[in-house]
Design a protein with these regions (language model features):
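Short, charged, intrinsically disordered terminal tails
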Residues: 303-310
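Short beta->alpha linker loops
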Residues: 67, 192, 216, 235, ...
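Residue-level recognition of short, structured coil/turn motifs
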Residues: 106, 184, 248-249, 301
């Protein structure tokens, strides 16, 4: 599949504080690409760099194979985005808002296209109502319609379910999936809520303190035959090094002086335990974790040092 966006060693700091550090990832055509991280992890900063709203201190961004800095205005024609809550004219109708923002795109956009995007986002029949009468979920959907009017290749959504009620959240999930499956859009969607990403994304990136922790297909990260095995050991700074070159190294997800986290089939736990004991590890406890939430928490532990791409 074609690569829509690629970043290489992207870094950004504010007043000597690293917001994003050496971030490299790629988004493929047709992906619903989940961008997952705790609040303050660097998600919004990265998205702003992708849109040219702020500039990286170092690193490169490529859109459809072309470096962003070389053709910024042209490349932005291929991207639609909502960063935080979209600003709209509440005293005007949804249709009038759509017309105004379509005009700002500097493209000739026919009325038929405006009708089409309203249909896509589920606002057909409400376009004549004033925006101030819309629910928050409807405003978000109108924002997406505005982002879609110029038929972009990529749609960037920053925390699109924030502030929505349960029905609004469900509607937004359904819309994101529909835009990908039925309308062929590539979507980059960020969230600090793991279960939101799990339900819509095909591929995902976990970011923590501005650094990539793991990237891969959601189905691979959620492999049903594998589980997380957390081994609590007596303090030993050498055990992780002993894993190098062994069959267990490829399964290691995270390591500290007092704990190791592996991702593997549970049937191998006895064999792993035997190897650890034979190599001097004082095992205090072995715990298994099955949920993606536990996986996320283990990956974003402050002491995680191992970065991995699936």
């Amino acid at each position: 599949l074609a690569t829509i966006i690629e970043t290489r060693d992207l870094s950004k700091s504010f007043k000597n504080v690293d917001a994003v550090s050496g971030l490299s990832f790629s988004i493929l055509k047709g992906d619903v690409y989940g961008f997952l991280g705790q609040n303050g992890a660097g998600k919004s900063t990265t998205m702003r760099m992708l849109l040219g709203l702020i500039y990286p201190n170092s690193g490169q961004i490529f859109i459809n194979g072309t470096e962003f800095n070389n053709s910024r205005r042209y490349l932005l024609q291929h991207i639609g985005a909502i960063i935080e809550r979209p600003d709209m004219y509440g005293y005007l109708s949804g249709w009038k808002n759509l017309e105004i923002f379509a005009a700002l795109s500097r493209q000739q956009i026919p009325a038929a296209r405006l009708h089409a995007v309203l249909e896509q986002v589920g606002l057909k029949g409400r376009e004549k109502d004033k925006v101030k009468t819309y629910s928050q979920g409807m405003k978000q959907r109108l924002g997406i319609a505005i982002a879609l009017v110029h038929e972009p290749d990529l749609l960037i959504l920053d925390e699109p379910t924030n502030g929505l009620d349960p029905q609004g959240i469900a509607d937004m999930r359904e819309l994101i999936v529909s835009l990908s499956r039925e309308h062929g859009k590539t979507v980059l969607v960020s969230s600090h809520l793991l279960h939101e990403i799990e339900q819509v994304a095909t591929r995902m990136l976990v970011i923590h303190k501005g650094k990539k922790i793991v990237e891969g297909a959601v189905k691979d990260l959620l492999h049903p035959d594998e589980t997380l095995v957390e081994v609590v050991i007596m303090k030993d700074a050498t055990i992780a090094g002993k894993l190098a070159g062994t069959q267990w190294q490829q399964h290691l997800q995270a390591s500290t002086d007092t704990g190791l986290t592996f991702k593997l089939n549970s049937k191998y736990i006895p064999e792993l335990s035997k190897w650890l004991v034979m190599n001097g590890a004082g095992i205090m406890e072995i715990r298994t974790k099955h949920s993606l939430e536990d996986y996320f928490l283990s990956l974003t532990n402050d002491e995680v040092t191992k970065h991995r791409t699936v």
